[in-house]
Amino acid sequence: MFKTLAIITKIDNYKEHHLLISLFSCEYGKKSLIVFGGKSKKKNTDFVKGVLTKIEFNKENSCLNSSLIQSYNWFLFDKYRLKVIDYICFLINKLLFLEDKNSEILNYYQRLLIAMNNSSNYLVDLIVLELEVLKSSGYQPDLSDSVIKKVLGGDFSINANSYEELSTLLRKNQNFQEIFSNFMEKVIAKVLNNLNIHLPFNRSEIIQKN
């Protein structure tokens, strides 16, 4: 039996009474698991796209058990925050396949969920998570001082190997957040376009009221 912390990124019906869930964990990468009896009321509430959960599964890729890490007010999320969940799950499902035990994706994703659950400004947390997804998938953008200076229009020097300095810089300035978010929209669009992946909605729709 295997145990791991994972994000459920997609849920499909499997035969008459079961579910097929796609998930990502830093320990095992992308996995598809069968949840036998997953459509029952007892089990169905445990498997929701976007939840961060502890999953137990066997070598036959059958899900044996799951437990939520933290509950969130999903029904209180407005359409923009719900689209953030759809968007991030889409990116992870399309771009991440291999395990990466050094990845901070799950930690950054949890930060994003907490910010949205608290109705806080989540734009910086979203940007940092996007950068980590791109890094883990091998498409990390150049974040050298010259690029940051060109994007934000100032004389800044940050550690390109860590997102903490960038995060601190963006949190101090709402205008910088919007500018860098527009930059990320172009970066994501270019990566997906090169891979012939079509984003089902415009990224700007998820930050319209942030």
Task: Give the residues covered by each predicted segment.
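Non-catalytic alpha-helical scaffolds and adjoining flexible linkers that form interface surfaces
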Residues: 1-19, 24-210
